[in-house]
Amino acid sequence: VELLVVIAIIGVMVGLLLPAVQAAREAARRMSCSNNMKQLGLGLHNYHAAYNTFPAGVRGGSASEGWGFPFWYGLLPFIEQQALAERVVNVGGPAPGQHPGWLGILNAGGHANSAGTLNAAVCNNVVVTSFVCPSNPMEPNRNAAGSIVTFPSYIGIQGGVDDDAFGAAGVSPPMAGAAGDTDRFQNKRQRSNSACCGGTTSNGIQSAGGVLVGNEYLGFKHITDGTSNLIVLGEVGDWMKDPNQNLVDLRGIYGWPMGTSRAERITTWVDFAGGDARQFNLTSIRYPIGTRVTTLPGTGNDFGPNNPLVSAHTGGVQVTLADGSVRFMTNSTDLPLLKRLATRDSGTTKELP
């Protein structure tokens, strides 16, 4: 009887202690995630100190030049990944300190020695730990067009966008300034009506209101709202769910090396019908934090110009601000405020929750 009593007491103690242990472990993982995001923020600052600008959100070239890299490449030398940065094949003669030509991990053009093919080998099985939140339940490295590459738990923030009154299903939303355009950020965004990859991404809205935007180099001087009032990085480190409650990974399908195939700035792009508008590793804020619906316009697991911020942390996500600090923002954060915090020059009063 005494033995049974002891066993029962031990069982009760384990039941009481286990949640505390799990909470402590998650607190440690969240702290590690915060440190990662601080390192990335410091990397952005050091890049700016070296080149007087932040890296472009993504770079792209002509159809023959193929896919460029996202801003992650520019950060590599500043997050203890100098060796990887030096091994990446440089094509296209970019400006010093900026992205290495146009060819990312894909679009090798069918040539065995093209930069795309060579970089696929360079990036293969290289784990970039700073890109991964320890709380993220998804596989940190997985196959991307034949290479095993890191899929970041974090994403660059292009800006914030509002919705217009769309027309019939499948009809492109109005362009900036056109009839029917009610987007208050209309001077700093473009539509992503891409002929490629279909789905809800065809009603995506891409912004250029932040500092990590396509084919454009922006710096502190452009952040007129103040660096403590601009989000530059957010989390995408948890599963989404489709209408059947199946788990869906919305980190994109090509991992950290993938940028864009477009050479234009967002504000000069025309309607994308017949073109490929994809920009990987970036999102424009359109939906509340913690939104996990995969059927909303602009969301997708190939790429999603409006994929929402999500994390495995309870109640919200961590974000990196342009001043390098990291803040936790809850799922209940006011959406209009979140969009303004994604915009470098909104001219409005912002108060972080």
What are these regions (language model features)?
Residues 1-29, 33, 39:
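N-terminal single-pass transmembrane signal-anchor helix
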Residues 23-353:
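Internal low-complexity, small-residue/proline-rich segments
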